[in-house]
């Protein structure tokens, strides 16, 4: 099973991109949640605009689906400049990054998603570009190779990553502003769902929006996806208005429970509790019990369960917590 196959996946899906752009906020005043990040960025942006300088290079990191791309677009909009978007895996050759950099205008924003996947060769080119706005690349090979030095207009590089630990120290140290995005509160997600519903023309009661928010795993991308599915259900099974009852019925049909768990989350937890007496149990045994690959369990299923306190990862194996027992209505077994 792939992460993108799940309804509650926080990964981006190509078919949703156009709709996501339609409901994406364009200014910090519309950007719900991440209050500390918003207030800091507002000050940095205002200061840069007063000086007519480019904003310092910005690194944004955090789990997928929390709005890193949205924040990058907001920064460019607030600065009143253009944004050029690309991603780490796409930039394969020195000529690729050179073409992008030489086409930037003064104070423009270059946004690189998945920046941790840049090759070392590309990183080496970025260092002088970020520090001195100079491009130094080699053209040709062997005896015919020659170095070309170009002046670049001042610009802002915004890098986004879900895995900040994979960034090399020299690259990470060149970002003057580093922002971490956290999972959203239910109140913030409720505001996001209500705003998206309004923009999509979906009549939604406040309680209906909150019910969707409760099951969205702290992630706006999931909240907006669930909103679209609940909208479909309400139009077919109801009168098109999303009430709390309609949201509950739709999400129960979609097998997304009150904690945002789907069938695979529940299957994993129940396997640990029922098959292995709550653990500790090794990852290979869990994989065999639920018929999933070890990598899928470690990368797709476990992180949210651990983050929410339903599962513990210990040197002896995985252990279901008392919170997991309570979720399924079991009495917790005393762990040694």
Swiss-Prot record:
Principal place of residence: cytoplasm
Alphabetized UniProt keyword annotations: ATP-binding, Cytoplasm, DNA damage, DNA recombination, DNA repair, DNA-binding, Hydrolase, Nucleotide-binding
Record-listed Mg(2+) binding positions: 69
Compartments reported by the entry: Cytoplasm
Region of interest (Head domain (RuvB-H)), residue spans: 258-336
Gene Ontology CC, one term: Holliday junction resolvase complex
A Pfam family per the record: AAA_lid_4
Region: Small ATPAse domain (RuvB-S), residue numbers: 185-255
Region (Large ATPase domain (RuvB-L)): 4-184
GO molecular function: ATP binding; ATP hydrolysis activity; four-way junction DNA binding; four-way junction helicase activity
Catalytic activity, EC: 3.6.4.-
CDD domains in the record: AAA
Domain of life: Bacteria
List of residues binding ATP: 23-24, 65, 68-70, 131-133, 174, 184, 221
Binding site for DNA: 313, 318
Physiological role: The RuvA-RuvB-RuvC complex processes Holliday junction (HJ) DNA during genetic recombination and DNA repair, while the RuvA-RuvB complex plays an important role in the rescue of blocked DNA replication forks via replication fork reversal (RFR). RuvA specifically binds to HJ cruciform DNA, conferring on it an open structure. The RuvB hexamer acts as an ATP-dependent pump, pulling dsDNA into and through the RuvAB complex. RuvB forms 2 homohexamers on either side of HJ DNA bound by 1 or 2 RuvA tetramers; 4 subunits per hexamer contact DNA at a time.
Alphabetized PANTHER family for the sequence: HOLLIDAY JUNCTION BRANCH MIGRATION COMPLEX SUBUNIT RUVB (PTHR42848:SF1), PTHR42848
Family label: Belongs to the RuvB family.
Domain notes: Has 3 domains, the large (RuvB-L) and small ATPase (RuvB-S) domains and the C-terminal head (RuvB-H) domain. The head domain binds DNA, while the ATPase domains jointly bind ATP, ADP or are empty depending on the state of the subunit in the translocation cycle. During a single DNA translocation step the structure of each domain remains the same, but their relative positions change.
Summary of subunit composition and partner proteins: Homohexamer. Forms an RuvA(8)-RuvB(12)-Holliday junction (HJ) complex. HJ DNA is sandwiched between 2 RuvA tetramers; dsDNA enters through RuvA and exits via RuvB. An RuvB hexamer assembles on each DNA strand where it exits the tetramer. Each RuvB hexamer is contacted by two RuvA subunits (via domain III) on 2 adjacent RuvB subunits; this complex drives branch migration. In the full resolvosome a probable DNA-RuvA(4)-RuvB(12)-RuvC(2) complex forms which resolves the HJ.
Name of the protein: Holliday junction branch migration complex subunit RuvB
Organism: Legionella pneumophila subsp. pneumophila (strain Philadelphia 1 / ATCC 33152 / DSM 7513)
């Amino acid at each position: 099973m792939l992460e993108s196959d799940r309804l509650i996946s926080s990964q981006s899906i190509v078919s949703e991109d156009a709709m996501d752009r339609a409901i994406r906020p364009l200014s910090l005043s519309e950007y719900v949640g991440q209050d500390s990040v918003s207030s800091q960025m507002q000050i940095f942006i205002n200061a840069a605009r007063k000086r007519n300088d480019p904003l310092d290079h910005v690194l944004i990191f955090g789990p997928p689906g929390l709005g890193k791309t949205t924040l990058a677009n907001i920064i460019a909009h607030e600065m009143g400049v253009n944004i050029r978007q690309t991603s780490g895996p796409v930039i394969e050759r020195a000529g690729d990054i050179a073409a992008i950099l030489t086409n930037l205008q003064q104070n423009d924003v270059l946004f690189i998603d998945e920046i941790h996947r840049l090759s070392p060769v590309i990183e080496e080119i970025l260092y002088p570009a970020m520090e001195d706005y100079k491009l130094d690349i080699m053209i040709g090979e062997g005896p015919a190779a020659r170095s070309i030095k170009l002046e670049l207009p001042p610009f802002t590089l915004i890098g986004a990553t879900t895995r900040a630990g994979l960034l090399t120290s020299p690259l990470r140290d060149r970002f003057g502003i580093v922002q971490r995005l956290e999972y959203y509160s239910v109140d913030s997600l409720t505001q996001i769902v209500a705003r998206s519903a309004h923009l999509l023309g979906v009549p939604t009661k406040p309680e209906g929006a909150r019910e969707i928010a409760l099951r969205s795993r702290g992630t706006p991308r999931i909240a907006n996806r669930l909103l679209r599915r609940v909208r479909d259900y309400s139009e077919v099974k109801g009168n098109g208005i999303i009430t709390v009852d309609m949201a509950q019925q739709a999400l129960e049909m979609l097998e997304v429970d009150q904690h945002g768990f789907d069938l695979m989350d529940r299957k994993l937890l129940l396997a640990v509790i029922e098959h292995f007496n709550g653990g500790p149990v090794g990852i290979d045994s869990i994989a065999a019990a639920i018929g999933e690959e070890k990598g899928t369990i470690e990368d797709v299923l476990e992180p949210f369960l651990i983050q929410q306190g339903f599962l513990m990862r210990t040197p002896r194996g995985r252990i279901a917590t008392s919170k997991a027992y309570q979720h399924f209505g079991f009495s917790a077994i005393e762990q040694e």
